Curated annotation (Swiss-Prot):
Pfam families, A to Z: ATP-gua_Ptrans
InterPro entries: Arg_Kinase, ATP-guanido_PTrfase, ATP-guanido_PTrfase_AS, ATP-guanido_PTrfase_cat, Gln_synth/guanido_kin_cat_dom
Membership in a protein family: Belongs to the ATP:guanido phosphotransferase family.
Organism of derivation: Symbiobacterium thermophilum (strain DSM 24528 / JCM 14929 / IAM 14863 / T)
Record protein name field: Protein-arginine kinase
Gene name as annotated: mcsB
Summary of the function given for this chain in its UniProt record: Catalyzes the specific phosphorylation of arginine residues in proteins.
């Protein structure tokens, strides 16, 4: 897969909407932070150090492809890309907002199905990420562990017998693992239970963030729930703990949905129908309004209020309607009004398909 194909399509494997509990869990993610033992952390690297890191990453990717993953991995140096294209990767959750800036010595390796991505020279030397559809933390971990093992065949990671893997941020020291689930929780928000739930999650050592992770706000009632520290626990324990909590959150959201629909059936049907009506007829729409209305429609699909729409379409729209993706499809820079017009046209077309 070439770079142009990568940034021209809004589809990724995690958007398929076929995983367990896809009505609530958009995706599961496993991220591993790794650093080479013979280089300083990224914040202290010299220019020769960064070139050595990029060359090491290229060698590591070659090793990954020798393992025989179903989807080939390609490495791209970000200095050779445009800001617009890098923003598309942010919108597709393949790189972080931080990785898209100051790119002279940075790279990213991405598999053809976009399930695997490896950020090079972000906060750590390597950030291995695996995304899976629905609640599939164990499957994402299986793939991430295989990628990690393949890299260790070629690279020597910084590791301490007592502390574990050494990372730039102390909260990642240990396993270097961050497990997360992206969840749609409209009923908990509408019944005003979300605040209490998030407080309880923080007491359990979890953190709740917005759609694009740290420093971002929740949009479309979509939240990212992840572990906060990785020291002193095995990878399997961290993942099992998050999965158990995710299942509890799913049960709580489902109960809230049943309560809402049982007590306020007419109001919910009106809210969902209005959202569907606007999205299928509007001639211009902002990203904020679209996110809010798509959240209502997604809830309506789960409750059977609106015609059955594939979750894949709803997931892909979350990305395809973002500013960078819209401009890439247009082949030119768009002003805000032009983006709103193209966004509305895109949503009308996809929902009526």
């Amino acid at each position: 897969m070439g770079w142009n194909e990568l940034v021209s399509r809004a589809e990724s494997r995690w958007m398929e909407g076929t995983g367990p509990h896809a009505d609530i869990v958009l995706s599961s993610r496993i991220r591993l932070a790794r650093n080479l033992d013979d280089l300083p952390f990224p914040q202290r690297m010299s220019e020769p150090d960064t070139e050595r890191l990029l060359q090491a990453a290229e060698a590591g990717v070659r090793e990954i492809n020798l393992v025989g993953f179903p989807s080939r991995v390609e490495l791209y140096r970000l200095a050779d890309t445009t800001p617009l294209d890098r923003q598309i990767l942010v919108e597709k959750h393949l790189i972080s907002p931080q990785q898209s800036k100051e790119v002279m010595a940075k790279a990213v390796a991405i598999s053809e199905d976009e399930a695997i991505s490896i950020m090079v020279n972000e906060e750590d030397h390597l950030r291995i990420q695996v995304l899976a559809s629905g609640l599939q933390l164990q499957e994402a971990w299986r793939v991430a562990s295989q990628v990690d093992d393949a890299l260790e065949q070629r690279l020597q990671f910084a590791f301490d017998e007592q502390l574990g893997y050494l990372t730039a941020c102390p909260t990642n020291v240990g396993t270097g693992l961050r497990a997360s689930v992206m969840m749609h929780l409209p009923a908990l928000v509408l019944t005003q239970q979300a605040g209490r739930l998030f407080h309880n999650l923080s007491q359990l050592g979890l953190v709740v963030r917005g759609l694009y992770g740290e420093g971002t706000e929740a949009a479309g009632q979509i939240f990212q729930i992840s572990n906060q520290t990785s020291l002193g626990k095995a990878e399997e324990e961290i993942i099992a703990n998050l999965e158990a909590i995710a299942r509890t959150v799913i049960d709580t959201e489902e109960q809230a949905r049943r309560h809402l629909y049982g007590e306020m059936r007419l109001q919910i049907e009106d809210r969902v129908s209005r959202a569907y009506g606007i999205l299928t007829t509007a001639r211009m729409i902002s990203s904020e309004e679209a996110m809010r209305l798509l959240s209502d429609v997604r809830l309506g699909v789960a409750l059977g209020v609106v015609p059955k729409i594939d979750y894949r379409i709803l997931n892909e729209l979350l990305v395809a309607m973002q500013p960078a993706c819209l401009q890439r499809q247009a082949g030119r820079e768009l002003n805000p009004l032009e983006r709103d017009v193209r966004r509305a046209a895109l949503i009308r077309a996809r929902l009526s398909a």
